[in-house]
């Protein structure tokens, strides 16, 4: 269940907990109680952690960058094992993590865009990425994706389902991002020469897209 913010993912998990909890068998409740205790035993008892542990007892969890690595790994592992039945997450879980989700629900197609200072519909590319979490080949024969939207369903299908993803554009063309990565490269590669820095970034996606040296001294 994908949400647009950390707070929203936590809220959706809480709303789903009572419904999911009613469908659990006694043996499942025992397993979830152990997972809940592990979360509490391994982490500082902040309000966030205590809330997570409470929801896990009902077969539900949330997942976002506000949780530490230990909690995220426990949640991912137990969802993968089928112990946690429903996972509410921010879009960060859409990339790089392979989880056995039969069904993906996109709870809101709008995201806040700081550049424009307003909410904007997600891109077709992000939609495809989110939906791609459902029905992973090694876990399921098929997957389902559901959009919760306010507009006409046919329009959503035409735009998102039948639409072509936008071209991928490197973020390194942004001065701030490039500066951060240059400093990171220099700090982790003692003795690196100027032409090596230029060569390194010229081989990135940004370098290939602008077809000229990414960095100029």
Range-by-range predicted roles:
Residues 2, 63, 87-90, 106-107, ...:
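Generic beta-strand/beta-sheet core signal
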Residues 11-16, 74-77, 100, 126-130, ...:
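Alpha-helical scaffold elements adjacent to nucleotide-binding pockets in ATP/GTP-utilizing enzyme cores
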Residues 72-108, 115, 132:
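Beta-edge loop/turn motif
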Residues 99, 103-161:
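Conserved segment of the helicase C-terminal RecA-like domain
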